[in-house]
């Protein structure tokens, strides 16, 4: 039996214990720090993903589907349906429906303000009348005297005169000196006076614009008078402002509109015509003599269409007053005051019914 026995090398008990210690090595803090250094951020992220995918609550299909959705930042059909239901229950906030000055006319069912109107294609204004253009002081004085004599011959107590001004503008230096005055008392003729060579306005021109029968009108005309006074102190802006008519303000009174008007929008609204407000001409050198054909036509159309707008608003005002008088005769003064207290729009509707 001894021949089948295998002799093992003699070892001490201490040696066996040391062997076991070598096999089972304890991790020291230094060793864990080294392992942490070996793992890059990318490897750590992959480990976290694998740990999340290997949870017992998730099956294989669920793990792959959810992880891919998380990485691609996509929504499942269920999540999309939930979002749609939430949006339908909580719609986005709308703008305030508070009635303002610009929307008051639309709220009353009246004429929309110029800002609310949809743009439409309108025919351009074509002026075929005469254009009388002067650059020298004596010529301007003679022309202004002729116009003043024509005004005095008119039977009307008030003679409307369209008034406008032009001047050069630079983004570096700002507005230049008043260079052009254009007027129109008859739709068949426009007068253009270039002031470049003038140090002082002719007395005949000052007398014309201050004539008691002349009613100057335009859009934002008060600002023109103030600039004219700054450039030519012999003109009194306050005296001209007292008797002038701003067409935009007058339109709001007659047509029950709101907001601020430009001459271009007034032409669209009142005359159903479009104006060619080319920036090339509008920002051109108005102080250079002579003015070219495009500049002359631009200046003439501004006062021509202003005169047309004035005549149209004047006729509308006469019609409105006539309707009010007829309503008073048929229904009495008390009924008229009661209806007017309800608003101008209501009164205009009543006038349409009675007519």
Swiss-Prot record:
Residue ranges, annotated region (Disordered): 1-121
Which residue intervals are annotated with compositional bias (Basic and acidic residues) in the record?
A: 17-29, 36-50, 72-92
Q: Which SMART domains does this UniProt record tie to the protein?
A: 35EXOc (SM00474)
**Domain (3'-5' exonuclease) ranges:** 147-315
Keyword Hydrolase in record: yes
Top-rank taxon: Eukaryota
Q: Cite a single GO BP annotation.
A: nucleobase-containing compound metabolic process
Q: Name one GO molecular function term.
A: metal ion binding
Q: What is its EC number?
A: 3.1.11.-
Quick check: keyword rRNA-binding in the entry? no
Residues bearing PTM Phosphoserine: 105, 113
Which of UniProt's keywords are assigned here?
Exonuclease, Hydrolase, Magnesium, Metal-binding, Nuclease, Nucleus, Phosphoprotein
**Cellular component annotations (GO), alphabetically ordered:** nucleus
Location of this chain's protein in the cell? Nucleus
Please state what class of enzyme this protein is: hydrolase
Binding-site positions, Mg(2+) 1: 164, 166, 302
Q: Which residues does the record give as Mg(2+) 2 binding sites?
A: 164
* Main location per the UniProt record: nucleus
Protein family (similarity comment): Belongs to the WRNexo family.
Q: What does this protein do?
A: Has exonuclease activity on both single-stranded and duplex templates bearing overhangs, but not blunt ended duplex DNA, and cleaves in a 3'-5' direction. Essential for the formation of DNA replication focal centers. Has an important role in maintaining genome stability.
What is the protein named? 3'-5' exonuclease
Organism this protein belongs to: Drosophila ananassae
